[in-house]
């Protein structure tokens, strides 16, 4: 038995301590984890410095932000765990009840998933978010961090397990796979005897590898080729504010805009204003400017590189924005449906008909009208921290909170009935 299999077996053996814990016990464990995380801040920051030093020069600046921890972010992680503790416990919720003509009483009840596996890349905060959500939803959790963030993840998990050790929940219910090589990931993908669910969080390559190779049931958290369409009837002040936020607030995250579509009737006047905001104003403020990849029509109005064949199918995760002009809301919808990963897409318009057409025909997990796509987030949706953004339709779609991490079973109460 490999070390990875041993860790999977430990999690499976410990799951009953979580599955059978009541709400008070789980909340007490989460609060202890949050306190322990803050108490271990110095150790976590030291580990994070190791990750940052190893990554220096090997990843883009925008990706470094995903990896970076500081005191404020550790406090935010701890507060995120406390926020999960404050959420209603979904386990045990009665979803439906019915009584059959023969007198059988049927109750559909929400239950824990069992053991959840998470494979993720260079975001240390996912470690605490995933642990908190899995444990509150009644499941043990097996984490597999990417190499870039492994030292940070190890220090975070050590702190969380120290918190669990003060409670009735077995610390073995939280595991961090030590094997950061490819084989560690593939063992999790094949671990049908140990894992009830596997969730990948990361880039397109990771997600594709898990979806194509896993025998464990998977919820796909897709990449975010996120579009915003500026309609000819848009309020320009709203449009400029929304585009600025959606592209520049955190370009390295999956709900950041990657493609801008602009109605051709306003492109000549709107795009130069946008260029001033995203390029010259940011340079003057000492901020990284946005670099444009332009279709031929957009290139007539602002400066940038000519868009290549793949630029409208790329999740840049950087200060890069692909820009295209379109002749109508119908063309915008066609382009989005052709290139979208069905994560988050939005329209800016004051035209109700255009907005209704867009929301009806765009088949994404989150569809926005006159708002930034950066709101596609479990915390912003009132779900607490999230396990990821599901872009599939079965079981879960959009930000995955506690309810999306549970299953259900039927309890059938009889008085001696037999089937004729």
From Swiss-Prot:
GO terms for molecular function: glutamate-5-semialdehyde dehydrogenase activity; NADP binding. Keywords: Amino-acid biosynthesis, Cytoplasm, NADP, Oxidoreductase, Proline biosynthesis. Its EC number is 1.2.1.41. It comes from Neisseria meningitidis serogroup C (strain 053442). This is Gamma-glutamyl phosphate reductase. It catalyses: L-glutamate 5-semialdehyde + phosphate + NADP(+) = L-glutamyl 5-phosphate + NADPH + H(+). Pfam families: Aldedh (PF00171). The gene is proA. Its main location: cytoplasm. Catalyzes the NADPH-dependent reduction of L-glutamate 5-phosphate into L-glutamate 5-semialdehyde and phosphate. The product spontaneously undergoes cyclization to form 1-pyrroline-5-carboxylate.
């Amino acid at each position: 038995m490999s070390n990875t299999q041993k860790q999977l077996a430990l999690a499976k053996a410990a799951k009953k301590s979580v599955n059978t814990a009541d709400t008070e016990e789980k909340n007490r464990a989460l609060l202890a984890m949050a306190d322990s995380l803050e108490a271990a801040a110095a150790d976590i920051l030291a580990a994070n410095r190791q990750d940052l030093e190893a990554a220096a020069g090997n990843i883009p600046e925008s990706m470094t932000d995903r990896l970076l921890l500081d005191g404020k972010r550790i406090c935010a992680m701890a507060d995120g765990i406390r926020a999960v503790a404050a959420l209603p416990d979904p386990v045990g919720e009665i979803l439906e009840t019915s009584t059959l003509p023969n007198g059988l009483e049927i109750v559909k009840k929400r239950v824990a998933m069992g053991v959840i596996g998470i494979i993720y890349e260079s975001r240390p905060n996912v470690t605490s978010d995933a642990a908190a959500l899995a444990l509150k939803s009644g499941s043990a959790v097996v984490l597999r961090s990417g190499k870039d963030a492994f030292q940070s993840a190890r220090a975070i998990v050590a702190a969380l397990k120290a918190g669990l050790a003060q409670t009735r929940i077995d610390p073995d219910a939280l595991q961090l796979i030590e094997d950061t090589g490819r084989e560690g990931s593939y063992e999790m993908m094949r671990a049908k005897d140990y894992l009830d669910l596997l969730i990948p969080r990361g880039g397109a390559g990771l997600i594709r590898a898990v979806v194509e190779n896993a025998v464990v049931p998977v919820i796909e958290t897709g990449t975010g080729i996120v579009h915003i369409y500026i309609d000819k009837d848009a309020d320009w002040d709203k449009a400029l504010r929304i585009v600025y936020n959606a592209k520049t607030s955190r370009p390295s995250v999956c709900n950041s805009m990657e493609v801008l579509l602009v109605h051709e009737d306003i492109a000549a006047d709107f795009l130069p204003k946008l260029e001033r905001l995203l390029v010259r104003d940011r340079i003057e403020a000492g901020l990284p400017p946005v670099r444009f990849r332009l279709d031929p029509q957009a290139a007539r109005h602002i400066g940038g590189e000519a868009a290549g064949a793949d630029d409208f199918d790329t999740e840049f995760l950087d200060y890069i924005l692909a820009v295209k002009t379109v002749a109508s809301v119908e063309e915008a919808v066609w382009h989005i449906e052709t290139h979208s990963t069905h994560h988050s897409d939005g329209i800016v318009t004051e035209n109700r008909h255009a907005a209704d057409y867009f929301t009806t025909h765009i088949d994404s997990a989150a569809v926005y009208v006159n708002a930034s796509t950066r709101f596609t987030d479990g915390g912003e949706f009132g779900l607490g921290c999230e396990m990821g953004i599901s872009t599939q339709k079965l079981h879960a779609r959009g930000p995955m909170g506690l309810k999306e991490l549970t299953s259900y079973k039927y309890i059938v109460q009889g008085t001696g009935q037999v089937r004729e």
